[in-house]
Amino acid sequence: LGQLNQRHLEEHPGDEKLAARIASYELAARMQLSVPEISDLSTEPAHILRAYGADDTGNPIKAGFARNCILARRLVERGVRFVQLFNGAYASGGELNWDGHNKLKEQYDRHAGILDQPAAALIRDLGQRGLLENTLVVWCTEFGRMPFFQKGAQGRDHNPDGFTSWMTGAGIRKGVSHGVTDELGRAAVKDVHPLYDFNATVLHL
């Protein structure tokens, strides 16, 4: 196969499409070969598993999210530049999630318990390993919830005009809050920025 590829390059000088495709396949192969080692959490010390909550047998969804947070740290350690995490809401079959049109208190109480310990442990772990100063952690959503109950339900409708996201690491100043909503928490009224600005900030950092 290598000889055929070399012959193609010789017969078609300047044609970089094949070389680019070969390089992409080789990169994909190397990535796949590294997955078993990266995803093997058996080498993690017991105190790390406890810190993240990965050993929480009473809350398997939380334990699963905790393992994903540990995996995220391991990926960052190996130079992966973008890692995305979900908090495990749909591991419950989608009934209990952040889309709180109904059962809002039940849903949010449960999912706050799922993400709180693992997320905090991830940030602390990155910091203790000297990785946080070069890693931007972003916690965000596509919209918030209205400050009043949805008609006929025990929940709240979508609110695209006022919600919270946070960042840490990568030189972010601690304790800084930017933007203010009105007195009801309904809409941003000061230092209002479109999502384009948010995305630009992430890319800049």
Question: Model segments located where?
Answer:
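Ligand-binding pockets and gating/stacking loops
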Residues: 1-205
